[in-house]
Amino acid sequence: MRTFLVTFVLVVVVGVISAYPSNPVEVEAEDFDAQDPDLQTFQDTFYEVPQVHSRQKRATCDLLSAFGVGHAACAAHCIGHGYRGGYCNSKAVCTCRR
């Protein structure tokens, strides 16, 4: 009981210290327009080419088969996608049941 009380008091003290407002920082009035990047730099970063991601179909069956949970991981993967379950076929690809 005493350990619980000490832990609770410690958590409350840390919470109060972190929530206590600090002194406001004085900010000098500067020319903020000079700090803005030019419009072309902004547009170049806005229209970047999206990254192409690799989708590996055999990850659940191949990688987890060493631990003996390949079929269970495949079934959980399929249930997560809204199917009734799944299994690893002979090519180590997860096949979902409908």
UniProtKB/Swiss-Prot annotation:
Induction context: By bacterial and parasitic hemolymph and gut infections. Expression peaks at 24 hours post infection by bacterium P.carotovorum, and at day four post infection by the parasite L.major.
Superkingdom: Eukaryota
Tissues and organs where the protein is expressed, per its UniProt entry: Is synthesized by the fat body and eventually secreted into the hemolymph.
Pfam families associated with the record: Defensin_2
InterPro entries (alphabetical): Defensin_invertebrate/fungal (IPR001542), Scorpion_toxin-like_sf (IPR036574)
CDD domains reported in the protein's UniProt record: DEFL_defensin-like
Disulfide bonds: C61-C88, C74-C94, C78-C96
Intracellular or extracellular location(s): Secreted
A single GO BP: innate immune response
Signal peptide: 1-19
Alphabetical keyword list: Antibiotic, Antimicrobial, Cleavage on pair of basic residues, Defensin, Disulfide bond, Fungicide, Immunity, Innate immunity, Secreted, Signal
Propiece residues: 20-58
Gene3D superfamilies named in the record: Knottin, scorpion toxin-like
Gene Ontology CC: one annotated term: extracellular region
Family: Belongs to the invertebrate defensin family. Type 1 subfamily.
Cited function: Has antiparasitic activity against promastigote forms of L.major, and antibacterial activity against Gram-positive bacterium S.aureus. Has antifungal activity against the yeasts C.albicans and S.cerevisiae, but not C.glabrata. Has antifungal activity against filamentous fungi A.fumigatus, F.culmorum, F.oxysporum, N.crassa, T.viride and T.mentagrophytes, but not B.bassiana.
Name by which UniProt lists this protein: Defensin
Organism, as annotated: Phlebotomus duboscqi (Sandfly)
